[in-house]
Amino acid sequence: MNANQCAAPQTFTAAKTQPAWQRLADETDAIMRSLFDAAVSQYRPRGAVTLLAIGGYGRRELAPFSDLDIVLIHEKPRIEEAFVTALWYPLWDSGRKIGHAVRTARETYSMIKSDLDTATALVTARVVAGDERFGQKVIDRCNIKLRRQSREWLGELHTRVLERHANAGEVAYLLEPNLKDGLGGLRDIHAMWWAHAVGLGMSESDLLVLNECNEVLLRVRTALHHITGHPGDVLRLQDQRAVASEAGFVDDDELMAALAAVARRVMWISDETWARLDPPADRSARSARLAPGVALMNGEIHLADDANPATDPTLVLRVATAAARTKRRIDRDSLDRLGSVSQTWPAPWPAGASDDLVALLLEGERAIPVWEALEQRDLVSRVLPEWSAVRCKPQRNVFHRFTVDRHLWQTAANAALFAHQVTRPDLLVIAALFHDLGKGYPGDHTEVGLRLFADIGPRMGLSTDDVALVATLIEHHLLLPDVATRRDVSDDSTIAYVAQRVGNTTTLQLLYALTQADALATGPTAWGAWKAELVGTLVSRTEHVLAGNSIDSTAWRLFPDAATLEIMAQGNRHIHAHDGAITIVSPDQPGLFTAVAGVLAIHGLDVLSAEAHSNEQGIAASRFHLRAIPQNGWSEIIRDIHQAFDGGLNVDERLAERVATYSRRKRESALGPQPPEVMFHDEASSNATVVEVHAPDRIGLLRDITRVFMQQGLDIRHARIATMGDNVVDTFYLRERTGSKITGANRQRIVKEALLAELG
């Protein structure tokens, strides 16, 4: 046997009829039979010998670079080593990674009793070569022994599933999912098949769904191996477009949506299946009626005997609310009946229906698994047909950890936590559920969402005033974080701008709660202490004004503060760092801000915001707020700033070294780089011109931008830095050296052209 015949992965091409993984398994079978027959012919082993394919190979599921799991079982106590070597060496020589074992039948039966990995691997074993009758006998006896100790194995198997889930991300929501080990991935399907094989019965419909999900995951994993040319289970961002094309999807968005849908179905069936191992403690308790048509029986939520989903459309929400409130599962027969009988809701909704929806939403986190159960039977879109467009829709960026629909559920759950802080908790959770609904449709998601809610709100039976208030929340759901992170919250013009758009304290109160709920549902980077402080300050100042007070009477933290003013009065250079901020006081000269930005970039530090001020005595002060405290302390940074001011540090050279070292390590982000854009906001501040710069992120970008301002004779009064994946939105409050705003279209054009030339 030529070793190259074992190298099937190198010759893989996508199959158009038979699934590629089955075809590759069949081709491998032929190779293994040929190797086995050649070894038997040469060494003639005594007694029955069989070669079993186990694990994925046993299921005929081989991706191009899958491990080849095989076990050689012999009847006699010993088998000639040369015979075994003749089987394995051609595979090793080909570079194929194999998981192999050699055992007697008796050893195999013994291991079944003590080793879960062996036991589960043999569930899908099949004879590839050798004595087929002997091999099948071994397989059958193993299955019998497995079923005899099924309870013990099921408990251990479930424990392993839970341990893996504790360390793995969810396939449905990760930007780069692990197709095999992630929650809702292939291993979860395998675990349920094993559980079913040893006695934890599953319905035919669930098994059919798992087979369909398994095929999608295999199709993607096979394409991944083919595209990358090496083994792996993590679907990296840079490979998703090519994998989508190879696997037959329209584009990478359709691929990730399909994976989300599949993984969520697998997770739900998995949860339902394993729940039967640990039934509710009060399963035998007497049944109780919880709501019209809804009963608690055997520890689960059931449709009552008199329930009729065909004539009672709101029954589905009463069932869901009862399940969330009691933290119980919906009985599968009841859920199936709701799915098969419930109709699309009429317009307008039945009386009290919006109250039922609000009741479910106010259950908070407990409602999320219930929403997922409803989705498994396509019940959410019967309540809200517009929901279909956001179901499993991916948000492929570094901020959002969830699909659009899951993000909306989570935002509503978070909003319920703020219910006691607002006067209209009902409108808060409704706005939370619908604030991003427009993302399922073409166009600006906020504008589309407003048009959608203009139809949904009246259909729900909301009053005209309530529809208008929810619409305001949807329209401005990004207002507070955008303004807080891109504008100077100590500027009166900023406060007036927000107050004019919000209109009253009730709306501001609701918008603040929605902002927090939305950010917390987005991901860990969307709501940190810095942003929370900025938004809180903005809300506090705006609330003061909306209550009828003068903007001038509000108190806020200014820069420079009293301590910095005292240092400035001394007229000397002073650099001081505390926590995540560094303050620099120095005799004023062009380029100080730029020099500090360059030094911070050399040390790999990200700037969140910065302020600058100079007095009539020619002393300048600036303060930079950083994303994180330097790991090695401030001493080297302070030293380099002094050297940069004195001309002893070549910032350009050091930055070039850092760019050469780190830029090539940068990995692709889902957002992708956007073309540079420069915008002037003349009315955003009463005493400075606000310039907003959108650009692809790069090492030293802040320094490059501020150097252009220096060259153009502009002073920086304030800066806000926001990084979003591969892109940044930097906002600067600028003045001419004379202290005036940047006026005149020609002057602004010159500044803009200089910036765009620098940004490339």
Give the role of each language-model region.
Residues M1-I54, R60-L62, S66-V398:
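Non-catalytic interface/linker regions that flank or bridge core catalytic/transmembrane domains
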Residues E27-R44, A48-L52, M192-S205, F399-I430, ...:
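Alpha-helical phosphate/pyrophosphate-handling elements in metalloenzyme active cores
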Residues T28, D67, L91, I189, ...:
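Conserved structural-core and active-site-/substrate-pathway-adjacent residues in large, well-folded domains
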Residues R60-F83, T403, F418-H544:
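Divalent metal-dependent catalytic cores for phosphoryl transfer on phosphate-bearing substrates
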Residues E80, V84, G182-G185, C213, ...:
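Active-site-proximal structural scaffolding
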Residues R96-G99, Y109-S110, P346-S354, V358-L361, ...:
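Conserved catalytic alpha/beta cores of large enzymes that bind or transform nucleotide phosphates
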Residues R141, L235, S245, F249, ...:
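Non-catalytic interaction/regulatory segments
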Residues P385-Q410, V607-A621, A628:
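Metal-dependent catalytic core segments for phosphate chemistry
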